C-alpha cells in the first residue's frame, strides 16, 4: 500500500492506494503547530479505524504548499512508518515540460494535478483547483505546462466580506433557492456562489480564446462539485485528482529508482 499526503493551506487530504486504486481517504485541518508525534498519533487512529497499521504502508509521497509543516511530516514518516517519504519538489521526476519563467515557482499541487490530468484525460487541458486559492492551469496539446491563473479562493472571498462588513454574518457556502435573495444570508450566498461561477466562466473563456484551443476543463478541490453544477464550462469533476497524481508520481519515481538500482 502507498500512502499519499496532499497538504494545502487550509486542509490536508490523505489517501491509501492499493494496486493503483484509492481505497481510503481522509481530510484533516492543516495545523502548522503540530509535532511529528501529534501527526503520527492522528494518522495512526485514522489507519486503525479502517483496519490498517503503519506496517501496511510500503511507500509514502508528500506534496505540500506549506513549507513550515514539512519538517514535522518527514520526521513523522521516518519515526512511525520507518519510511523516508518522497517529497514533490526539486529532484522529483515529473515528466512535465514546464514553460514557466521560473519552473521552481510552480506549486507542488499544480504540478501533481497536471501529471494526473494529462495521464487520465489527455491534452489540451485546463485544470481548475478550488482550494484556499483557486488555481487555473493550462496544458497545451503538446502536454507542456504553459502557466495559469491564481485567484483568491471562494472561502477567502466569503471571509473577506464577513470580516470587512460589520453587519454581515459569516455564512455557509451553499446554493440559495434563488439568485434574488430575500434575506441577508441568501443574498450573500447568491452573490458569493454566482459571483464565483461568473469568475470561473470568464477566466476559462479568456484562457480558451488566448490558447485558440478547446481544452477539456477539469475541476477538483473541495467545492468543485458545487461550482460545476452551476457552471457551463466545466467538463469533468475529479475530486481526487491530486491524490491520483501523487500516486502516479510515486510509481514513476519508484520505477526510475529501481532501474538505477537504488
Curated annotation (Swiss-Prot):
Homodimer. PANTHER family: TYPE III PANTOTHENATE KINASE. It comes from the Bacteria. Belongs to the type III pantothenate kinase family. It comes from Bacillus cytotoxicus (strain DSM 22905 / CIP 110041 / 391-98 / NVH 391-98). GO terms for molecular function: ATP binding; metal ion binding; pantothenate kinase activity. The active site is at residue 109. The lineage of its organism: Bacteria, Bacillati, Bacillota, Bacilli, Bacillales. Substrate binds at residues 100, 107-110, 184. This is Type III pantothenate kinase. A monovalent cation. Ammonium or potassium. K(+) binds at residue 129. Keywords: ATP-binding, Coenzyme A biosynthesis, Cytoplasm, Kinase, Metal-binding, Nucleotide-binding, Potassium, Transferase. The keyword DNA damage does not apply. GO terms for cellular component: cytoplasm. InterPro entries: ATPase_NBD, Type_III_PanK.
